[in-house]
Amino acid sequence: MFLNKFWPNNTFKQILIIYIPWRLALFLALFFAVNFIPLAGKNFLGGGIGNYTANPYLFAWANFDGEHYLSIAQFGYKDLEQAFFPIYPAIIHLLSFPWQHSFISVTLIGLLISNISFFLALYFLFKLLRFDYSVRISYLVLLIILAFPTAFYFASVYNEALFFLLAILTFYFARKKRWFWVGIFGMVAAATRVFGIILFLALLIEAWQGRVKIGSYFWILLIPLGLIAYMIYQWVSVADPLAFYHLQTIVGPQHESGIILLPQVYFRYIKILLTSGLSNPIYSIMVLEFVVGLSFFILPIIGFLKKVRLSYLAFALIGFLLPSVQGSFSSAPRYVLILFPSFLVLGIIVDGLPKLFKIGYFIMSGILLIFFSMLFFRGYWVA
């Protein structure tokens, strides 16, 4: 009885109807990638070249950053891994405790966490959007997220899905005025990714606009504690509370330690795209980065004109700008996945298009999703 009240069957089924085909499509992409696309090389493969070669259908989901999360989950932090926040690998570690010596088991636990988190995120995002928007718009936003060219990261051994869930739960309980849970989920989110600190600013705006009682702000103040706790750990372990930031120039050498103005970043990309040939193997990635970098700056601005909630827009705009001012959009196609307000604005725009254009959008986005997921599965850098 309680579960029926908390989890309406119709909503569950509606999301399941779109989630299962999405997972099947990604598995088919993996199948064709393994059989028809050569490996990019021997590095950055999930589990290392030996494990990947023996079981590519499992370890392809743990390429690039996935290797680090699995290593932290099994062995704790090693040199140069402080850029990866602790909550996701900690949960993998706890749930895989009886089987930690099995790399396959740890990987399966990581995938289970990501996929369950993403499904729950879709469910609560639908409920969150229904506070202000129709069923049609809410459902359309979910479809747009699922079809996004880098949405495969939600199903991989990455912390995107977990953070996405935590961020949505934070906003959801803010709209329900359950501020204790806002503080708890926001605090955990801030220890999951550095983007969690943006929730603090966004929720202050939400509380101010809602004219909540002064005592509710106490719970919002819990949010930064997640990041502060990780900074204290880094201070004790490596004598650098900002190691997660300083290591960005090592794990992502395309990033710079200073602040680069956004127009400079756009100019760099325009110059690269005009001077690089179409035969360049990373040209398609550069185009994706530039389009995402431009779109996700414009979408919050359009959202303001569409009267989207200010707290949502703050989360979307600051969440885009925070990594972009390091001088590159190199990981932007993945970073923007958690910026649900931008997808909301995109959903509003797509909803206003003629039917033929809507179909065209989803066909194009779906093709790009399959294309980039296949590249990722075979060890090519995507985001």
Regions found by a protein language model. Give the residues of each.
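Short hydrophobic/aromatic helix or loop-helix immediately within or flanking a transmembrane segment
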Residues: 60-101, 265-268
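Transmembrane-helix signature of polytopic, membrane-embedded enzymes
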Residues: 104-109, 125-147, 308-314
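Loop-to-helix entry region of an early transmembrane alpha helix in multi-pass inner-membrane enzymes
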Residues: 82, 86, 90, 100-120, ...
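Multi-pass, polyprenyl lipid-linked donor-dependent membrane glycosyltransferases
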Residues: 113-117, 132-174, 181, 188-199, ...
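Membrane-lumen/periplasm interface segments of specific transmembrane helices
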Residues: 25-41, 60-61, 200-209, 213-299, ...
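Signature aromatic-anchored transmembrane alpha helix within multi-pass, membrane-resident enzymes
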Residues: 220-224, 352-381
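Transmembrane alpha-helix segments characteristic
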Residues: 304-325, 335
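Transmembrane-helix motifs of polytopic, lipid-linked glycan transferases
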Residues: 109-132, 295-302
